[in-house]
Amino acid sequence: MYKDIKVDPAQLEAALDARLKIRAGFDKPTAGMAAGMTQVNMISVPRDWAYDFLLYAHRNPQSCPVLDVLEEGIYATKLAADSDIRTDFPRYRIWKDGEMVDEVTDAREIYNAHPDLVTFLIGCSFSFETALQEAGIEVRHIHDDTNVPMYLSNIKCEPAGRISGNMVVSMRPIPSHQISEAVKITARMPSVHGAPVHIGHPESLGIKDVNKPDFGDASRIEAGEIPVFWACGVTPQAAVINSKIPFAISHAPGYMFITDIPDRAWMG
């Protein structure tokens, strides 16, 4: 749970401006937007599947840290004022029987056609990137204005009911001398994925080519840098695919919802 701390009015304004910009049609990855404000992933599943998913998230908290749950017919989250999860992500993916069938920028009609959906908002590693930058650690995909690279790993998540799947991981190249600091910073923020799950040796995670991510864009890895992998909130989408959930709506990887909660509120 986040700490109730005073929020800079300028940060709140930046977060609201970002949501309004997205609502008006902004369609790019959100890393670096409203810097210092928490971003979240999303998955909506039918009520009949909601308990299974809640249990799945509970059993896999590093990859699926639940920050809010919205009951059917509820589209505003306590994490942000003047919010609508049907319009405030830049892109949505529509899933049927484990297959992605569409990608849209406004999901209101789809939610209206499926009123039984329960929505889970999941912590996102974008929320520790400002802390990394403040420590002098470059976040490559922000620097290069690309999407973070994400990979389906060979790490099996703990199954729950009808839901199972493997962990998706995100990667950031970190200079070898800064890795210990990156671990210390992110370990303090378990609600947004916490410490890395793996350092170096992508092949150990079943990643054949680190330059060919399953989601997002490849990141440059310079001499002296090591690929560092964190659990990722795209893991629920891997579960949707593997479990062939009859219907689901998710965000598009890297296209997040921006909240009114400062990143530092999650620091332990």
Swiss-Prot record:
Lineage, uppermost ranks: Bacteria, Pseudomonadati, Pseudomonadota, Gammaproteobacteria, Moraxellales
GO molecular function: lyase activity
Keywords: Lyase
EC number, UniProt record: 4.2.1.-
Pfam families per record: D-Glu_cyclase
Species, as recorded: Acinetobacter baumannii (strain SDF)
Protein name: Putative hydro-lyase ABSDF2257
The family this protein is said to belong to: Belongs to the D-glutamate cyclase family.
